[in-house]
Amino acid sequence: YETGKKMTALADKVADEGYDAVFLMGVGGTWDELMQLEYLMNKFGDRDLEVYLIHAAEWNAMGHKRMTEKSVVLTASESGTTPEVLEAVKKMKEKGIRVYAMTKPEGPIGQAVGAENCVKMASDHGNGGCEMGYYLADCFGLRLLNRRGCFPQFDKFIEQTKDVWTHLVDIRKSFEPRAEELAKKYALAPYTMFIGSGALWGETILFSMCILEEMQWKRTRYITSADFFHGTLELVEPGVPVFLFMGEDENRKLDERVRAFLNRGVTGDTDINIIDTAEFAIPGLDDEFRVI
């Protein structure tokens, strides 16, 4: 909560100075995480707001024509050493572009952007996890929207998420038995398919690529609910574990179409798993904020 206030203050600084476009820059997991904020800023923003999600490695190779000295960049690196991000940040600073980072001030990236433009991503116990990255980015992006008159419920959102960390731990504890069951059942599967959409799509990629592929060397196939019917459905067959992450935003109807197909049984695949965020309550959080 207190760290979030620092991100809010940085957003206020940007709003006071003015900007022509917002760039959210990551690589790997941070790119995946920032996808959620891109979705939210486009969902709640006005038609004149320009928000771009950019990949640091791609920006280093080709730049971006809409980025000017009036633009603002938000990036992240929990380690503070991500090579692609560091290279991009240095180039951006040379061009006079404002860069703010969720990273440790003493790290190379933190030093490049300046300690006053950093907010530490890790918690006091050594790590922040994805939730910290999402929360801090949302504090920054939603505050910018609030200053534009697009998200008047900002203060209410911040107040209602003040103790969200405790509730997230409770959700994990309640899901642990099912998680253990799924892990034992599918640990040795040749590959696993993950499907998601909307606000959950970035997290779907992150879980597949960073948690399973990078950390556990598990083969995965991740696909959006929107694209599932344009090729990937042909790969659903007996013995292939399929996980559908169902969200609560406008794209839920796309998830529901996928669920209906999977549950028809026409593929012969019985390893179908539905994880629906609507089944996990967060006390004190209004329905309008659940998509966030």
Enumerate the predicted regions with their spans.
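Active-site phosphate/pyrophosphate-binding segments
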Residues: 1-21, 125-126, 133-136, 142-225, ...
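Glycine-rich phosphate-binding loops that contact phosphosugars or nucleotide phosphates
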Residues: 15-154, 160, 245-273
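Generic structural signal for helix capping and beta-alpha/helix-loop junctions
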Residues: 61, 109, 229-230, 282
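Short, ordered loop/turn segments at secondary-structure junctions
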Residues: 104-106, 225, 277-280
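Aromatic-enriched
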Residues: 162, 271-277, 290
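Internal helical hairpin/lid segments
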Residues: 202-276
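Structured C-terminal subdomain patch of bacterial secreted/periplasmic proteins
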Residues: 267, 278-292
